[in-house]
């Protein structure tokens, strides 16, 4: 470990102080001068005067500015032998010298050495000097940390990271799956590098670009790519770094940030998680947060106020665009809003190709198959997936990852860590029937997603799992698809009831019932897919703030609410009856599949369908199932 001079100084100062006081106390001038004459016995001053009156004192040596005397005395009490005795003298005893002279006692005074006085003075001044020096050192460090030397108490200085030419190691070629957003930002970068091609036709540089999208979709990665490509000064800061414990700090930091940005224009200012400071004003109980609102007001003024900010492009990222203040979103501040959504199949494939560049894979590994099997995965999820697969490959001591590691990693990312396999018991058989109930319905219903695999290996909180893979990216879902999913979700409970009886139905279907109820209620209240008609009965005016939402209530009558509950119950009941009917009609193949599942613990989708085909016809679907 390399030690800096500051670290060495920090450790050496206490050692020096302790050593100095140790040396002064035990090796100082007092020990040198008096130590050779020090006596083992002591005597009070009054007793010393008695000895002097009786003529027993022969010699007196004075030390320490006449505060200490070494007395040579002889007498009956001392065994008639000369004894050296130490006597502490009072501060003021003018008659002592006179008495000693009258008694003809040898008297000698030993003044302290000049070096002793110097060391005494240094000893008295050392601690205060070290204290003052330490405080000055800490104060200087505090100033440097908050904005540079000589800027004491600079709480209002911006904490933005400034890079004249940002070297993030990320360029646009490293960003995949968000082609539309890349085009927007490539245009911004071109505007910064070659503004004349735009100004020639009267175009103005955009003042702000807002990145909106779910977590993990690559918003911050895009900002890093812009910083790596733009070759202009780049400021980056988080929205949470503006407001702190002191009043007025947020607005002051905004002013300081934009002052620095204007001094270095043209430049880019990136504000990550802008929702921390850009929330709507006047919300919440009590009217909101005054300090945050002052910061937001200052930000609004700096972005498009009286003075303007020519040459400064503000790029912000958030996954909560619905709570941002409307004044912040208007043109002139954020001219463009770029949506960065979860990637589709092509986007996932491009992202996997980027992250697979530095991974060793077997030739049989198909990135297209992985992309098909991971609908809904964000860019961060896909990066984590391949990293987990690489870790698992190293753990298994393989030279390259295979589809087996990738399949296990997908299961881990989606459902959690693998648990201990179940032992053969009635509970294991019940779980097997539950999972096969889901899978058989998913295979036989035309509009249901195809089965990928069925397993009894526990993961997370689930004792068993049935995996379905959508045949394509479904941005639009039909009524028949929703109903098929409801029937499939009820398949596990239906199998429990048909096989083991109503008394043996377990709590294992609790999560299924939550999903079923949610889907059925959305069919009625959001999508207009019930007998109530094409009505949206969900309130769209609710805000994610306690203040405005406290007074909100339902926008329909009690009669309509009762009808909604009736329609939800009717949809679920019809789907449950259909699920039980499918279970009863396919009891033979279900029993065979359960026995095979208990034996193997995992059945892949192709094998599952091949067995079902021996007993009944299966609707044609698109299958993207990995082969091992």
Curated annotation (Swiss-Prot):
Question: Which residues bind Zn(2+) per the record?
Answer: 434, 438, 512
Q: Which UniProt keyword terms apply here?
A: ATP-binding, Chloroplast, Hydrolase, Membrane, Metal-binding, Metalloprotease, Nucleotide-binding, Plastid, Protease, Thylakoid, Transmembrane, Transmembrane helix, Zinc
One GO CC term of this entry?
chloroplast thylakoid membrane
- Quaternary structure annotation from Swiss-Prot or TrEMBL: Homohexamer.
Q: What's this protein's function?
A: Acts as a processive, ATP-dependent zinc metallopeptidase.
> Active site at which residues?
435
Outline which residue ranges sit on the Stromal face: 1-7, 140-628
Cofactor annotation remark = Binds 1 zinc ion per subunit.
User: What main location does UniProt list?
Assistant: plastid
Q: Where are the transmembrane segments?
A: 8-28, 119-139
Pfam families recorded: AAA, AAA_lid_3, FtsH_ext, Peptidase_M41
Residues where ATP binds: 213-220
Molecular function GO terms recorded: ATP binding; ATP hydrolysis activity; ATP-dependent peptidase activity; metalloendopeptidase activity; zinc ion binding
**What InterPro entries does this protein map onto?**
AAA+_ATPase (IPR003593), AAA_lid_3 (IPR041569), ATPase_AAA_core (IPR003959), ATPase_AAA_CS (IPR003960), FtsH (IPR005936), P-loop_NTPase (IPR027417), Pept_M41_FtsH_extracell (IPR011546), Peptidase_M41 (IPR000642)
Q: Does the keyword DNA damage apply?
A: no
The entry sums up its family as follows: In the central section; belongs to the AAA ATPase family. In the C-terminal section; belongs to the peptidase M41 family.
Q: What is this protein called?
A: ATP-dependent zinc metalloprotease FtsH
- As recorded in UniProt, its EC number(s) are 3.4.24.-
Q: Which cofactor does it need?
A: Zn(2+)
Cellular location of this protein? Answer: Plastid, Chloroplast thylakoid membrane
Q: Which residues lie on this side of the membrane: Lumenal?
A: 29-118
- The species is Pyropia yezoensis (Susabi-nori)
Protein topology in the membrane: Multi-pass membrane protein
């Amino acid at each position: 470990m390399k030690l800096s001079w500051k670290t060495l100084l920090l450790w050496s100062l206490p050692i020096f102080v302790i050593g100095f006081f140790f040396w002064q106390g035990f090796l100082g001038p007092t020990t040198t001068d008096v130590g050779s004459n020090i006596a083992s016995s002591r005597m009070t001053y009054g007793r010393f005067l008695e000895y002097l009156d009786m003529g027993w004192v022969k010699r007196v040596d004075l030390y320490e500015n006449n505060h200490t005397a070494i007395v040579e005395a002889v007498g009956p009490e001392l065994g008639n032998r000369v004894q050296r005795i130490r006597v502490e003298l009072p501060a003021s005893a003018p008659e002592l010298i006179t008495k000693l002279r009258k008694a003809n006692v040898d008297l000698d005074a030993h003044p302290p050495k000049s070096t002793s006085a110097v060391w005494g003075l240094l000893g008295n001044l050392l601690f205060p000097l070290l204290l003052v020096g330490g405080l000055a050192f800490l104060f200087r460090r505090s100033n440097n940390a908050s904005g540079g030397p000589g800027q004491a108490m600079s709480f209002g200085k911006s904490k933005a990271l400034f890079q004249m030419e940002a070297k993030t190691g990320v360029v646009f070629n490293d960003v995949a799956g968000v082609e539309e957003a890349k085009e927007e930002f490539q245009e911004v970068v071109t505007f910064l590098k070659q503004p004349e091609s735009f100004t020639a036709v009267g175009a103005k540089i955009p003042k702000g670009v807002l990145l909106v999208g779910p977590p993990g979709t690559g918003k911050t990665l895009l900002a890093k790519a812009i910083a790596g490509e733009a070759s202009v000064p780049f400021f980056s800061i988080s929205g949470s770094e503006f407001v702190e414990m002191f009043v007025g700090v947020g607005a002051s930091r905004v002013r300081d940030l934009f002052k620095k940005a204007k001094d270095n224009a043209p430049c880019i200012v990136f504000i990550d998680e802008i929702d921390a400071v850009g929330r709507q004003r006047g919300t919440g109980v009590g009217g909101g947060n005054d300090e945050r609102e002052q910061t937001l007001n200052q930000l609004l003024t700096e972005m498009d106020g009286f003075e303007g900010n020519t040459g400064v492009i503000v790029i912000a990222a958030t996954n909560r665009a619905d709570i941002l203040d409307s004044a912040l979103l208007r043109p002139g501040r954020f001219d463009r809003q770029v949506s960065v959504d979860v990637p589709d199949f092509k986007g996932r494939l491009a992202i996997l190709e980027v992250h697979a560049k530095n991974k060793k894979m077997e030739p049989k590994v198909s990135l297209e198959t992985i992309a098909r099997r991971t609908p809904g995965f964000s860019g961060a999820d896909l990066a984590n997936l391949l990293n987990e697969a690489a870790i698992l490959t190293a753990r298994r001591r393989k030279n390259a990852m295979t589809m087996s590691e990738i399949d296990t990693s997908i299961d881990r990312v989606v459902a959690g860590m693998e648990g201990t396999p179940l032992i053969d018991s009635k509970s294991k058989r019940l779980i097997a029937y539950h999972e096969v109930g889901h899978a058989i319905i998913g295979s036989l219903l035309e509009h249901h997603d195809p089965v990928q695999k069925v397993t009894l290996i526990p993961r997370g909180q689930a004792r068993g799992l049935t995996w379905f893979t959508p045949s394509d990216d479904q941005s639009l879902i039909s009524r028949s698809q929703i109903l098929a999913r409801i029937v499939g979700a009820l398949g596990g409970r239906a199998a429990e009831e048909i096989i083991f009886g109503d008394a043996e139905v377990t709590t294992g279907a609790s999560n299924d019932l939550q999903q079923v109820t949610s889907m059925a209620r959305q069919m009625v209240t959001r999508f207009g897919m019930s007998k109530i008609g094409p009505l949206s009965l969900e309130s769209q005016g609710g805000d994610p703030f306690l203040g405005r939402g406290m007074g909100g209530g339902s926008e329909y009558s009690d009669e309509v609410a009762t009808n909604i509950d009736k329609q939800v119950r009717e949809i679920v009941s019809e789907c449950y009856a259909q699920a039980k009917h499918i279970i009863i009609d396919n009891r033979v193949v279900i029993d065979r599949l359960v026995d095979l599942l208990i034996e193997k613990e995992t059945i892949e989708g192709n094998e599952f369908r091949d067995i079902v085909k021996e007993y009944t016809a299966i609707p044609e679907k698109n299958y993207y199932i990995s082969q091992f």
